[in-house]
Amino acid sequence: MAKSQDVRPVIKLRSTGGTGYTYVTRKNRRNDPDRMVVRKYDPVLRRHVDFREER
């Protein structure tokens, strides 16, 4: 069974472009304790935008 406070939890990255598009990834909680912001491609907008971690 998975621990409730896993070191590498699964997180959702939601587009800031307002399209609602999400990426699902894992992050290391020890190295990145704050919310992640990653610049990735949004296929709905057909451009790169910031994706923010959603909890």
Curated annotation (Swiss-Prot):
UniProt keywords, alphabetically: Ribonucleoprotein, Ribosomal protein
Signal sequence extent: none
Presence of the UniProt keyword Ribosomal protein in the record: yes
Pfam families associated with the record: Ribosomal_L33
Domain of life according to the entry: Bacteria
Coiled coil: none
InterPro entries assigned to the protein according to its UniProt record, in alphabetical order: Ribosomal_bL33, Ribosomal_bL33_CS, Ribosomal_bL33_sf, Ribosomal_zn-bd
A GO cellular-component term linked to this record: cytosolic large ribosomal subunit
GO BP field: translation
UniProt GO molecular function: structural constituent of ribosome
Family listed: Belongs to the bacterial ribosomal protein bL33 family.
HAMAP family with a match to the protein in the record: Ribosomal_bL33
Name the record gives this protein: Large ribosomal subunit protein bL33B
Source organism of the structure: Kineococcus radiotolerans (strain ATCC BAA-149 / DSM 14245 / SRS30216)
Gene field: rpmG2
